[in-house]
Amino acid sequence: MLNKIIHNNKEKIVIGYFSSDFKDHAIGQLTVELLELHDKKKFEIIGFYNDNIEDHLTIRIKKSFSKFYNIKNLINSKVISLTKDLGVDIAIDLNGYTKNSRVDIFSERFCPLQISFLGYPGTSGIKNIDYLIADKNLIPEKNKKYYTEKIIYLPNCYQPSDSRRLVIDKKLTRSEFNIKNDQFVFCCFNTAHKINPKIFDCWANILRAIDNSVIWLLENNNISQKNLKQEAILRKIDPDRIVFCKRTSSQEHIKRYQLADLFLDTFPYGAHTTANEALFSGLPIITIIGESFQSRVCSSLLTTIGLKELITNSYEEYENLAINIAKNTQKLQSIKENLKINIKNSPLFKSKFYTENLEKAYINIYERHNNNLEPEHIYIN
């Protein structure tokens, strides 16, 4: 049964975004410009923040909302009452099953329309979440049946971007990270829990095939670093060819991508925000496409930015492509030149275009609801 709370004579559609990540976090980084660009004549945008951290990105994000509420210390019933008092038409969960999530609220029908977006790479399994925002590369038609939500298909990549993101105005050098200028640098800045034995086997094979190469990873903790070094030794790879860099501000982190030659994605849980960062920085990324949401995000980004040739279908294909590119300087340079052009021309980093398409989706589902129509798959062209 549709829950008819929307009033047809409202001047604006009221959108409520719920997140614990309105800060210098992957979700905050990806959504900030989308929130800023929303058409405030058509939409009232309200933020519901489930954390107490406030940083430079929180300040920027808060300015994009007409109202901003910290719900960290509010029980569910209070949050539900607040959203009803504010007349929220569409509630959007940006967390899913992630840290400090309030996704449990979405098990209740507290808003007329409820959407899962961006934070969790898969179905929520919650019957009161009506829609999931995706794209055709991410969820092919044959896979719709595995989702409890109806799919809102955006025309390009489902992932928003921040074209205004800050990058430090400072030259970085490889020597700062214990990397030599003449080394071929593969990198993977995905978090350590995405690195499994099979993908590490691939990396070892690639390192073995490419002399004077290293793989550059992000520090997580001493235990994971020790384990990865040990796994390298077991595969007869010099552990010094596994190089780690410390966590730092997003502004400096993005700059570091420019020091690498080629990004090697993980599988089956691939790069999401890190893929966005790499491509934005001009660094090509090789991925393996799978069937699950989390194994198709990087493929969606690569397709949108016109680099489908970097999408592989197997571990063997992934290894061979990485080795082939690393051995062929001219081919790598050609890929990087195409990427540089496509950063400017493809829809991936055109935030205004992205926002307009998402708003078309919001208007579409809002009008369907007002016409007493049940949620259905939505295709935005």
Label the model's feature ranges.
Residues 1-178, 191, 201, 230-236, ...:
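Alpha-helical solenoid repeat scaffolds of the TPR/TPR-like class and their adjacent stem/linker regions
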Residues 11-14, 180-187, 213-214:
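Charged active-site motifs of nucleotide-sugar-dependent glycosyltransferases
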Residues 42-46, 204-234, 239:
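A conserved nucleotide-sugar
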Residues 279-280, 284, 303:
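Short alpha-helix at the nucleotide-sugar/activated-sugar donor binding site of glycosyltransferases
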Residues 295-306, 311:
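Short acidic/histidine- and often glycine-rich active-site loop of Leloir-type glycosyltransferases
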